[in-house]
Amino acid sequence: MYLRKFFLLIAVSLTVLSLQNSWSQKAIAKGLKEITPEKIKTHINYLASDALLGRDTPSPGQDSAASYITKAFVQYGLAPVNGSYLAPVPLITTSLGDDNQLEVTVRGVTKNLNIKTDFIPFETSSSGSIEGNVVFAGYGITAPELGYNDYFGIDAKGKIVLILTHAPREKDTTKIFNKYKSLAYKVKNAITHGCTGVLVMTDPLNHMILSPKGFPWPTLYKNFPKEAVALTLKDTAQKKIPLVHVGKELMNILFGSVDSLKSLETLIDNELKPRSKEYTGITIKLRVNTIENRLKTSNVVGYIAGSDPKLKDELVVVGAHYDHVGFMKQHKEGERYIFNGADDNASGTSGLLAVAEAFSKSKVKPKRSVLFIAFTAEEKGLYGSQAYVQNPLFTLSNTVAMLNMDMIGRGNPDTLHLEAGALSPDLTAIAQKENADIGFRIQVDGTEFLDRSDQSSFYHKNIPFIMFFAGLHPDYHTVRDLPETIDTLKASKIARLVLKTAWTVANDDKHYKLIESK
């Protein structure tokens, strides 16, 4: 009797599971039919139209794009978050003031260096004056797992730190220092060691052009557009310190000659042993004068609450950036001057809208919650996605996956790239499985584009991701990236694959492997 009840219970459970799977399949089938080349084309034709003037951040054209996306989310029945479909992203523009100075005093003899030829502030520099002793901290790297620390044996606290660009053994194909090469990392590391300012020199051993670059401030370059001011994210501006790029003149003063510095680098490269040192009898006085103005732009968000009592607190993010690079202020009469950005990234934004609509039309709601985000300011430095992960609308630790669409409308009609797919093997496997009846030849690429789109911000917060990407083309960031060049059939097929992948993830209870960012 008990055995009969047991088998009856199993039969009922299997029937329920079968019905649930049937409902789910019907729901996804209806959603797939909602994604058509015609709908993709309609979205792209508006977002990449001349009227929006390239959707620069910030601009009236970009505001129009945000309004279009907002209206679509409202039409699809997606919910706002915290009462709004707009999530503000505070940006700061920075221009260079008049009073910028760099003085070097060697045993009582002072030399004034010249802005532009000898030093140029970076756009991420703070404004202010500092004076103090100098420490040379090599490449500015602390890599305990490699047994390498440029700060070993020196005290940078309260001093001005001098560092090289790039990393030891730059030509080594293993690239073991790759993740330590960025200026952002080096400045953060210098601040951790208590410095008051940072001077950056181009590595002369592997690079011929040693003149300072910093930022191409319009006041320093006659042919540079006056509107081309530096843009940074307000939330990252709190930890700024004076930061300038210096040239050969300071190398000669501090090292005797450029060749002497090259010899020092060669020793570091050969032995992987830092040659950092504190200078005695040498002080530097630095003044950086920058002027900041605050700007407003927004990510556009739409939300579908999960249906499962336990899983609804977990979140799947589906994203695409909706900004582009604007238009040329100076141009000849009759020539094209608008960077329409049809593929980059009106195509991905259109895919985002298509997937959002498909989800909304489903009568079966996902178990996990889903947040659709159209990111702003990707072209300026991934600022929209950075702002989100710094101030997330939902607990970041509950975000199980981020699916990103960037440039999904060009290239071979049968080929799809999953960028850096090996870093999220479980999600990549799901996408490959869901592709079975769509039929792309999927290429799981390396990490070349990992930090070039919005998935990067999530990856560096240890969130598994997929970047759906159709590939680069000669019209990338040119005035030729136009709506008529888009393969809307391919874009719609990629959007269907994103839908299927997102649906599977949103109805799963698993957590996915990530080869983590350190």
Language model: regions and residue ranges:
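Acidic/histidine-rich catalytic neighborhood of metal-dependent amide-processing enzymes
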Residues: K179-Y185, N189, L205-N206, G326-L427, ...
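Metal-dependent peptidase/peptidase-like ectodomains
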Residues: N112-L113, A228-K262, F375-P474
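Soluble metallo-hydrolase cores and metallopeptidase-like ectodomains found primarily
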Residues: K26-I28, T105-N112, K116-N149, G153, ...
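Noncatalytic luminal/extracellular "stalk/propeptide" segments of secretory-pathway proteins
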Residues: L53-R169, T297, A422
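Extracellular/luminal Protease-associated
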Residues: N114-L233, A305, Y337-N340, D344
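N-terminal hydrophobic or amphipathic helices/low-complexity stretches enriched
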Residues: S22-P80, E249-I253, S257, D313, ...
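Bacterial Sec-dependent N-terminal signal peptides
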Residues: M1-A27
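Active-site-adjacent substrate-binding region
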Residues: I191, G197, T202, L267, ...
